[in-house]
């Protein structure tokens, strides 16, 4: 049974299933679908609120764990010199889509679509990792390279959400951010007292951070991003991204171990709450988001990867021009975070639905990447 569960998680089945159910429901019974996700059902909270503002706290918390571990000595982003090329590629993978989006928006869009520039900046780590292993094989250095830039990419994505996408319906009230700072202080004190349980950090520190962000009209889903780095962890990281170290029983590792499976299966709810858009929603925002993810990511990562090499920071062995281009293409899968940003970037339902459709269609990059990898005879390393 455990093997089957891990297989479902590995292939992102819960997320994909949630997306499919949402699409079918929203197109067959749109009134019923929107009533389900928008009507209050528990303590005045809607299903959409519970998923996007409460469940996603755990999703971004797990992302913060990966970033924290990668930055520790021995981690994939430490020392900085060995991570320079992936970080430059990350920069290209963020700036490239933004430039493509804004450039195309000036041609086929309009001022009302400008706020969507942040949608194509982040990569869906889990789906990109899956597709990369199918294209390159699990042992290919390009897979690790992609994971590094995807994690750094998500860190930038979190910052973009926090800074550039406050609640458009309410002015930001920065005074409440002192509560978020108080949550960080609590987490620091707990660590100083050598508290080994992650519950006080998450409940007290995370609760204060969530309340501060919510009252400030920012995105409370980011609450644990400010708390996770304070969880006790080893002085040195011994495992790579997505690798479990059975010897690591630190508070940080236990939080990830206990909640990652909840997040993986909970993504069914995320897909259900966010992917319900009508097929008629296809519009200018759809093509802006899709083109920015596919073209912007590919060109940006390819260009900056070679800039890094020219500056003396080499690409991994066995990663040449076609492997780097394929890595950029796979990084264009922006499903999860792109859906989230589309939901906060646009208030108008038609534009939001159109942008979300672009994020959903980016999942089709997986098929293109697998076929192109075979056509280009990309060498697979099991």
Curated annotation (Swiss-Prot):
Pfam family, one: Na_H_antiport_1
Reactions the enzyme catalyzes: Na(+)(in) + 2 H(+)(out) = Na(+)(out) + 2 H(+)(in)
Keywords attached to this entry: Antiport, Cell inner membrane, Cell membrane, Ion transport, Membrane, Sodium, Sodium transport, Transmembrane, Transmembrane helix, Transport
Membrane topology designation: Multi-pass membrane protein
Spans through the membrane: 11-31, 47-67, 88-108, 116-136, 145-165, 170-190, 261-283, 299-319, 327-347, 353-373
Gene Ontology, cellular component aspect: plasma membrane
Listed InterPro entries: Na/H_antiporter_dom_sf (IPR023171), NhaA (IPR004670)
GO BP terms in the entry: regulation of pH
Source taxon at top rank: Bacteria
Record carries keyword Hydrolase: no
Cellular localization per UniProt: Cell inner membrane
GO MF term set: sodium:proton antiporter activity
Family (UniProt): Belongs to the NhaA Na(+)/H(+) (TC 2.A.33) antiporter family.
PANTHER family: NA(+)_H(+) ANTIPORTER NHAA (PTHR30341:SF0), SODIUM ION/PROTON ANTIPORTER NHAA-RELATED (PTHR30341)
Protein's job: Na(+)/H(+) antiporter that extrudes sodium in exchange for external protons.
Name listed for the protein in its UniProt record: Na(+)/H(+) antiporter NhaA
Name of the gene encoding the protein in the UniProt record: nhaA
